[in-house]
């Protein structure tokens, strides 16, 4: 990790924050040139660099201390290691470079000589955290490293894709299908008006392509990329222009299946392996990387420890609701002694061909891994229990922390993340890393490590054991607040404000199809014309994913005067897996915050709407790698105004996942709405443009200064809790089967993709 810090350091730092206006900013030529460089430098990052301009730049690398705003011993050691060939093959240094020229040169050098995983890690951190890089973006992590998000079968097919071979294959495939699918319905039994075809009789959920008669190989995409907001792009003349002459190919992609052992948990693989869901966790840990100190990077202004731990709670709440949709119930408790009933096979492959390790059913945690780590992690939880119970902690430098104050959750959060702002950096800083290494049966003393999902942020949430272990982490959060006095009636009451009613529109989830850009997996020859790269082919992974129809709230709030207020919205379960009502005291741990927004009430009755698309922390589908690169090139030619908000901010949670799967007949859930006074001196998003920036280190990311999860952060006294400015609303979440029609009616174009699947 020290290498990553150094690589981050050598790539650059500038310390001035900028204030943006609310108008859409258009990139200038200088910005576009920088953006072009970033897109090209990570193109096929596992292959040798093929752009001559950047190769020459990388070869011009020099190591001069004057080029950096801050220079430390790790940077010096890195260069010494490089001279003697002792660095990881390819990977590490970027944040403290004085200017773009130094940064660019160092990045080109690192791309050629450093480990590709370390390179992308450090480059991502630099782009996210440098103040002078606001607006610059990298492709999404699942576009840079698709193999961390899609199964090995798909990855192998993408890596061996060859257009000439594909063209011949498709010719024979067509002749084959013309015979195979001719009058196919007459050969199979029509029973109760349902069509059960040979190619769909072994259909499993989410294997949509079998219902259309497709195979798991490449198909030409002659229309458009599939996604939520595709209509916006398909009607854009500039969009159609940039894709003229570009060949697109898609392949159906499955989620993890039971291959070697039965495992009911794989029924949730569509959720735990969701690309956007896993990317969210990755970027959270990039935004608040454990080794970045809060003072230098301004992260302490964002309550980084509390925010990280609250996100753990949010993700667990969301996962629990998805489990309830399938009748699974509580997340199993993690134990270092008892065996883990359900195993997991990620079916992923590293870029060098080595497969990711898997865990069998009834896995015994204590029987594997390095026992030094085992005892360190056990000791850590014992110490946390001790200091929280005691209520006072004295740091190694003599500072006393009162753990009965609610704001002390910031310290607890930093300890649980193991970041460098911890109270006792020597003991607490490494426990989190040791825990992941132990669960991945890794060893710091070995030079070669087998890939394991617990060793990468972008893969760890795929495993059901992740939620079991992080439930143990979240238990420390709740243990801390168990010692904080519950809110009193007076503290919760907002005099003069009453929520009279909230109407919720119909809540409907469904599965749709989406294309992910996986062009980085291609191995064919790159095309250059006059030294300029021509992006003429794009590979797409077409996958089914959970989504929901847009919904809205109709608020009716009465106020005795005009005033600014904060309105919070939470979603939580109503019943457990056995149909029993969950008491509010227990259920507070299961509510997930969906939205909080500022609103100015007038005196009297206020009626207004809030739409799901406006939730403050969610994002729509991001613009793809191919599209971004082509837009940049068009803008450099002066034919397009490149807006800085062309893609969604990296830190947003996928909008389509805010609702759990639900049931066909309606799954009972409940919304909780809460209105509080707006008393914060600052205005949210006031120092940055939230349409493209995450505002890290700004101190104004959040709507106010109350504890995250308020008022569900503390234990609930039901005699004190209920006030007129709160409102509970019982709802049902319905699930519609988008693909049911394929069983109900004959599909006339069997063997061809159905673009009307969602109608």
UniProtKB/Swiss-Prot annotation:
Q: Where in the cell is it found?
A: Secreted, Extracellular space
What does the record say about tissue specificity?
Fat body.
Kindly state which keywords UniProt assigns to this record, in alphabetical order. Secreted, Signal, Storage protein
Write the signal peptide boundaries.
1-15
Q: What is the purpose of this protein?
A: Arylphorin is a larval storage protein (LSP) which may serve as a storage protein used primarily as a source of aromatic amino acids for protein synthesis during metamorphosis. It is a constituent of the sclerotizing system of the cuticle, and serves as a carrier for ecdysteroid hormone.
Describe the subunit structure.
Heterohexamer.
Q: What is this protein called?
A: Arylphorin subunit C223
Naturally occurring in which organism (per UniProt) = Calliphora vicina
């Amino acid at each position: 990790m020290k290498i990553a810090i150094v690589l981050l350091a050598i790539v650059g730092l500038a310390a001035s924050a900028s204030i943006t206006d609310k108008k859409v900013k258009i990139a200038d030529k200088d910005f576009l040139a920088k953006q072009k460089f970033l897109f090209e430098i990570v193109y096929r990052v596992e292959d040798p660099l093929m752009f001559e301009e950047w190769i020459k730049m990388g070869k011009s690398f020099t190591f001069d201390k004057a080029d950096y705003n801050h220079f430390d011993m790790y940077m010096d050691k890195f260069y010494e290691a490089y001279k003697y060939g002792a660095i990881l093959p390819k990977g590490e240094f970027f944040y403290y470079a004085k200017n773009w020229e130094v940064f660019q040169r160092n990045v080109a050098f690192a791309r050629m000589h450093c480990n590709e995983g370390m390179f992308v890690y450090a480059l991502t951190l630099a782009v996210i955290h440098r103040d002078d890089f606001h607006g610059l973006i990298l492709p999404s992590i699942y576009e840079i490293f698709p193999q961390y998000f899609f199964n090995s079968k798909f990855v192998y097919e993408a890596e061996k894709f060859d257009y000439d071979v594909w063209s011949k294959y498709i010719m024979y495939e067509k002749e084959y299908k013309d015979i195979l699918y001719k009058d196919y319905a007459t050969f199979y039994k029509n029973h109760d008006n349902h069509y059960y075809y040979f190619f769909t009789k072994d259909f499993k959920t989410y294997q949509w392509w079998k219902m259309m008669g497709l195979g798991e190989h490449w198909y030409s995409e002659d229309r458009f990329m599939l996604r939520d907001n595709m209509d916006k792009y398909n009607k854009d003349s500039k969009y159609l222009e940039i894709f003229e002459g570009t060949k697109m190919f898609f392949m159906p992609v499955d989620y993890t299946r039971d291959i070697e052992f039965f495992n009911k948990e794989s029924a949730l693989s569509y959720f735990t392996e969701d690309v956007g869901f896993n990317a969210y966790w990755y970027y959270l840990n990039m935004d608040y990387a454990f080794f970045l100190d809060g003072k230098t990077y301004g992260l302490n202004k964002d309550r980084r420890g509390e925010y990280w731990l609250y996100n753990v709670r949010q993700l667990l709440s969301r996962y629990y609701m998805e489990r309830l949709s399938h009748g699974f119930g509580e997340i199993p408790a993690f134990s270092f002694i008892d065996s883990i009933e359900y195993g997991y096979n990620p079916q992923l492959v590293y870029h060098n061909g080595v497969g990711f390790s898997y865990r069998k059913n009834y896995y015994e945690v204590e029987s594997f891994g390095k026992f030094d780590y085992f005892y360190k992690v056990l000791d850590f939880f014992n110490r946390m229990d001790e200091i929280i119970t005691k209520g006072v902690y004295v740091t190694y430098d003599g500072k006393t922390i009162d753990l009965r104050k609610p704001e002390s959750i910031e310290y607890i959060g930093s300890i649980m993340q193991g970041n460098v702002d911890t109270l006792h950096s020597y003991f607490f800083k490494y426990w989190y890393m040791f825990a992941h290494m132990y669960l991945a049966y890794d060893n710091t003393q070995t030079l070669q490590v087998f890939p394991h999902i617990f060793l990468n942020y972008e893969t760890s949430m795929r495993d059901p054991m992740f939620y079991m272990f992080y439930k143990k982490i979240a238990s420390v959060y709740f243990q801390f607040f168990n010692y904080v006095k519950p809110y009193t009636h007076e503290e919760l009451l907002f005099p003069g404000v009453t929520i009279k009613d909230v109407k919720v529109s119909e809540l409907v989830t469904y599965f749709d199809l989406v294309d992910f850009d996986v062009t980085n997996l291609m191995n064919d020859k790159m095309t250059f014309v006059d030294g300029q790269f021509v992006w003429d082919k794009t590979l797409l992974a077409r996958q089914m994913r959970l989504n929901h129809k847009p919904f809205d709230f109709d608020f009716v709030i009465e106020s005795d005067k005009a005033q600014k207020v904060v309105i919070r919205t939470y979603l939580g379960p109503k019943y457990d897996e056995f149909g029993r009502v969950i008491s509010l005291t227990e259920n507070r741990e299961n509510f997930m915050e969906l939205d909080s927004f500022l609103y100015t009430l007038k005196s009297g009755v206020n009626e207004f709407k809030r739409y799901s698309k406006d939730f403050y922390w969610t994002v729509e589908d991001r613009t793809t790698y191919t599209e971004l690169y082509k837009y940049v090139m068009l803008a450099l030619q002066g034919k397009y105004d490149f807006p800085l908000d062309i893609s969604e901010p990296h830190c947003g949670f996928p909008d389509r996942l805010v609702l759990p799967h639900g049931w066909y007949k309606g799954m009972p859930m409940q919304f909780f709405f809460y209105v509080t006074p707006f008393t914060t001196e600052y205005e949210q998003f006031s120092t940055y443009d939230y349409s493209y920036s995450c505002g890290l280190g700004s101190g104004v990311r959040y709507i106010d200064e109350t504890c995250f999860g308020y008022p569900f952060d503390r234990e609930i006294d039901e005699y004190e809790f209920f006030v007129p400015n709160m409102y509970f609303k019982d709802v049902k979440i319905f699930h519609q089967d988008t693909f049911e029609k394929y069983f109900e009616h004959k599909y006339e174009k069997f063997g061809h993709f159905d673009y009307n699947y969602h109608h």
